[in-house]
């Protein structure tokens, strides 16, 4: 990572991420979309368990995309949720996004910052369905001229190699 940012800038970016998480928890998806850059790259790959000897050699097992979404694809996912016909979300999930260990650094691009956070996403649905998603997110955020922020990239890395939930319809 490049140079760390000032405490004030760290606070501003952290507050942006906390606000973004609350929008998802409150099902304010249109407001959440407004926080995304037009060029957003929103990705999650499968997690593959690699042998220690392979990791030492730098051998990475092949992975598959779980999501590799653009803003248009995220808008379509949200439009589907809004129809009431997304059966995976009937009744709607109750989520809680927790983020911690926020590390923020400058990038080579002016006003773009690299963010690494650990996250825990708790999802409850119906009476007894509960799921925990735990991992690391690698985000890039862009500061706009009016001192607002936009999410430019999000790469979600799950710690779980096997996803035990019935579906993966929540947003990270």
Curated annotation (Swiss-Prot):
Pfam families: Ring_hydroxyl_B. Keywords: Aromatic hydrocarbons catabolism, Dioxygenase, NAD, Oxidoreductase. Gene3D superfamilies: 3.10.450.50. This is 3-phenylpropionate/cinnamic acid dioxygenase subunit beta. SUPFAM superfamilies: NTF2-like. HAMAP family: HcaF. Transmembrane segments: none annotated. It catalyses: 3-phenylpropanoate + NADH + O2 + H(+) = 3-(cis-5,6-dihydroxycyclohexa-1,3-dien-1-yl)propanoate + NAD(+); (E)-cinnamate + NADH + O2 + H(+) = (2E)-3-(cis-5,6-dihydroxycyclohexa-1,3-dien-1-yl)prop-2-enoate + NAD(+). Belongs to the bacterial ring-hydroxylating dioxygenase beta subunit family. Part of the multicomponent 3-phenylpropionate dioxygenase. Converts 3-phenylpropionic acid (PP) and cinnamic acid (CI) into 3-phenylpropionate-dihydrodiol (PP-dihydrodiol) and cinnamic acid-dihydrodiol (CI-dihydrodiol), respectively. It comes from Escherichia coli O157:H7. One of its GO terms (molecular function) is 3-phenylpropionate dioxygenase activity. It is an enzyme of class 1 (oxidoreductase). This dioxygenase system consists of four proteins: the two subunits of the hydroxylase component (HcaE and HcaF), a ferredoxin (HcaC) and a ferredoxin reductase (HcaD). One of its GO terms (biological process) is 3-phenylpropionate catabolic process. Its EC number is 1.14.12.19. InterPro entries: 3PPDioc_HcaF, HcaF, NTF2-like_dom_sf, Rng_hydr_dOase-bsu. Pathway: Aromatic compound metabolism; 3-phenylpropanoate degradation. The gene is hcaF.
